[in-house]
Each structure stands twice: as structure tokens, then as C-alpha cells.
């Protein structure tokens, strides 16, 4: 039994390989399909696969590679459609696992060549991908289900899921772009330096304005007004003016008396 857990969506997949599985009995896939409505409660699903290539495995493979989208459950569905929906659930979980790895390793590079390398690495490291890859590489399959065709199909589906989940931030690493973070830090440092230079230049301009203005005496004597001294100055000016007028009058009188 192989068990793989996807922590992001809580899906647990169990793969059982049994040699004594009788195809005449009820298929375990039927049991999975009967729990279609309970899937969102994060139940465990058991998938029984015969190690030998059989018609059931071929149907499972074709449904796995061709039926990518979910079908909402309706009443009066035949068991074959239930089987298809059960396989779609497995396929969706597998695709999410691929997208999570791609988003961590290379968030913006969904290139076919890079995806092919990632798929080959996952085939050796991941149990789910390895099982599907071994089924795909068997000689009894049709040419339309070769590994290159499957990779292209999975690439398209991964790209679709990536665009759907881009805004939801469902997978770790999608929005973590080192180049973008570095550019943000550089812009922040540049803004800080510019603000610092602006503040220093504004302080320098203020100091120049203060130096160019006339000095102001801040002593207490300069700020107080001496009323007595001002009155003495006014009186002295008035006295001088009176003396001048009197002296001029005396001069005129002297001239008149002399004329007499």
C-alpha cells in the first residue's frame, strides 16, 4: 500500500496493488464513486489496481488522461459516470501536487521543456507520478497515450489550474518572486535616500535664510521701552527750538533799535 498526503487540500490517496482482485466483483472504484458527495469532507479513498495490464486499467488510464474537469453530481447517474468522476478527483489531486512543486521550483516558467524535466524527476521521486508513468510506458497502450502526449496534456491542465489559483494564493511559493522583492527593496532604499537628501537640503536652506537676516538683540533692555528717556529727548528738542526762535527775535529787535 502506498500512501501520499497533500497537506494543502487535505487529500489522502491510498494505492493498493492486489493480484487476487476479481473483476467480477464490485469494483473498488464504485465504492469511491459512491462517496462522491462526501469527498469535500476530506475522506480517504482506496484505489485498487491490478499489477497486470487489464481493460479496467486502460479505462482508468483513459479517464485519467482525458476527463480533466469536474462534473457536478446529478441524480440518476450511471455507474460508469460515477467511475469517471472518481478518477477525476484523483486526477485533480495529482495535478494540484504537480502545480505545487512547479510553483515552488519555478513560479513563472511553465515551459514544456522545463515541465518535461520536472515530470521525469517526479516520476522517480513521487509515488503517484511514478505509478502513472509506469502505466503509460507499457507497450500495450495506444500511440495517442504516449508519455509526450500525456506530458502536454498535464502541462495544459497545470497551466489552467495555476491561472485559476494565482489570485487565491493556494500554493506556497507562487507569489514569492526574488527579483520582485529585490526591486522593491531597491526602490525603498532609493526613496529613503531621496527623502534624506531633501530633508538635509531643506534644513540647509532654512539656515541660510536665518544667517542672511539682520541680527536681533534678545536682551531684556532692547525689548523694553524707556519712556522717561524718550520724554527728555522730546523736551530737549523743544527747548532748542524755543531758544532759536527767541534768539532770532532778539536779533530783529537789535537791528530795529540800531536803526533808530
Curated annotation (Swiss-Prot):
Keywords: Meiosis. Residues 199-213 have a biased composition (Low complexity). One of its GO terms (biological process) is meiotic DNA double-strand break formation. GO terms for cellular component: mitochondrion; nucleus. The keyword Isomerase does not apply. Residues 197-222 are annotated as: Disordered. Transmembrane segments: none annotated. Disulfide bonds: none annotated. Component of the DSB catalytic core (DSBC) complex, composed of at least rec12, rec6 and rec14. The complex interacts with mde2. Despite weak sequence similarities, may correspond to the subunit B of a rec12-containing topoisomerase 6 complex specifically required for meiotic recombination. Retains some of the structural features of the ancestral archaeal Top6B subunit (AC O05207). Belongs to the TOP6B-like family. Required for formation of the rec12-mediated double-strand breaks (DSBs) that initiate meiotic recombination. May be involved primarily in the early steps of meiotic recombination. This is Meiotic recombination protein rec6. The gene is rec6.
